[in-house]
């Protein structure tokens, strides 16, 4: 995938494939910067919902990307480390560990039972501070997850009153 970090110009319209580590390093740096612009869950009016990005989300995503970048992946020449530099791999593991420890030590998110988490998800509960740290928000007719991944139906359903998950 060609990574575009600047607007297209006639010279950059046809970029070659970008190395995945270039993309992951950029994402790690961007997420580090983003942490200064978002609050912790329930810290302000913007982070009271799991449908808004919080510091827990940015740190969690940063940890996940760091783990992926430090590990093995399928490459055109076979399965190998994403980075051959052992020092960089250790730095990436340290980033993941520190971000996770920061989330845990702050205590803004609590872990409940599986049942409580499942019921909150089914009830479309979006209150921040529980196990779920981020959920993609859908408006009334845009939540086509069940249409895409669920059972197809031709008739209007009882919940959205739309046929085919809203694609008519």
Predicted regions and their residues:
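Conserved, well-structured interaction surfaces
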Residues: 1-2, 11-25, 29-47
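Aromatic-lined, polymer-binding surfaces characteristic
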Residues: 1-7, 49-57
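Short, hydrophobic secondary-structure boundary micro-motifs
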Residues: 2-4, 43-46, 75, 111-114
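Short, well-ordered helical secondary-structure segments
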Residues: 7, 45-47, 121
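Generic alpha-helix detector with strongest preference for long hydrophobic helices that associate
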Residues: 8, 43-44, 84, 154
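A short, flexible beta-alpha/helix-coil linker loop
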Residues: 8-9, 73
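Second-shell loop/turn segments in exported
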Residues: 10-18, 49, 81-89
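An aromatic- and glycine-enriched ligand-binding surface/loop that stacks and positions planar moieties
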Residues: 24, 32, 52-168
């Amino acid at each position: 995938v060609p990574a575009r970090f600047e607007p297209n110009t006639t010279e950059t319209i046809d970029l070659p494939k970008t190395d995945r580590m270039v993309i992951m390093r950029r994402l790690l740096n961007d997420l580090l910067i983003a942490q200064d612009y978002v609050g912790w869950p329930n810290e302000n009016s913007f982070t009271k919902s799991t449908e808004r990005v919080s510091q827990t989300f940015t740190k969690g995503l940063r940890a996940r990307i760091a783990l992926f970048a430090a590990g093995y992946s399928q490459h055109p020449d076979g399965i190998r480390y994403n980075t051959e530099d052992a020092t960089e791999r250790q730095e990436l593991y340290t980033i993941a560990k520190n971000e996770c420890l920061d989330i845990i030590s702050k205590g803004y998110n609590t872990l409940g039972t599986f049942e409580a988490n499942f019921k909150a998800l089914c009830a479309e509960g979006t209150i921040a501070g529980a196990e779920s740290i981020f959920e993609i928000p859908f408006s009334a007719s845009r939540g086509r997850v069940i249409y895409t991944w669920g059972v197809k139906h031709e008739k209007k359903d009882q919940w959205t009153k739309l046929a085919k998950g809203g694609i008519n």
